[in-house]
Amino acid sequence: MPKGRVKTKPRALNFALGFSRGDIIGVLDAEDAPEKDQLLKVANQFALADPRLVCLQGRLDFYNAHRNWLTRCFALEYAAWFHVMLPGLARLGFALPLGGTSMYIRRSALIDLKGWDAFNVTEDADLGLRLSRTGLRCALLDSKTCEEATKMPLM
């Protein structure tokens, strides 16, 4: 990462974008465990899609969801978001507020939008809204990425 005052994830993503060469850019967090065939599903869904579809959002889940009360609460929130809210927004044709991981986007669309907003801590949701505003579409990917839920009790 080059030196500078702004030290955010979106700035790091923009920096890495300059080194990318593929047509599809994927964003996964270091602790993520995507399904083994997730990249194949991404390639297939993009290959069969309308050209206006430029972004796919995978489902997130936790591999330690049943560890304690707190992890179950996190799992319940993710289940509501990824199985109810996002599919509902997609069916209604609304903009999808993207998540910061398990997200895949056509490089050309990202370049046209000038990348991520380096000053925005909700750069992922912002990107989904900016894509929608320009007439481009996001869709849900039928694939799961697991991560670890915070397991520390409240007290």
Regions found by a protein language model. Give the residues of each.
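Long helical/loop segments within the catalytic core of UDP-sugar-dependent glycosyltransferases
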Residues: M1-G22, K36-V121, S132, P153-L154
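Short aromatic/hydrophobic "clamp" motif used to bind/position activated sugar donors
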Residues: I25
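Active-site acidic Asp-centered loop
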Residues: L28-A30
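Short, glycine/acidic-enriched loop or turn micro-motifs at the edges of active sites
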Residues: D32-P34, A109, T145
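Catalytic cores of eukaryotic secretory-pathway lumenal/extracellular enzymes that build
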Residues: G100, L140, E147-M155
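Catalytic donor-sugar/metal-binding loop of nucleotide-sugar-dependent glycosyltransferases
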Residues: F119, G128-C146
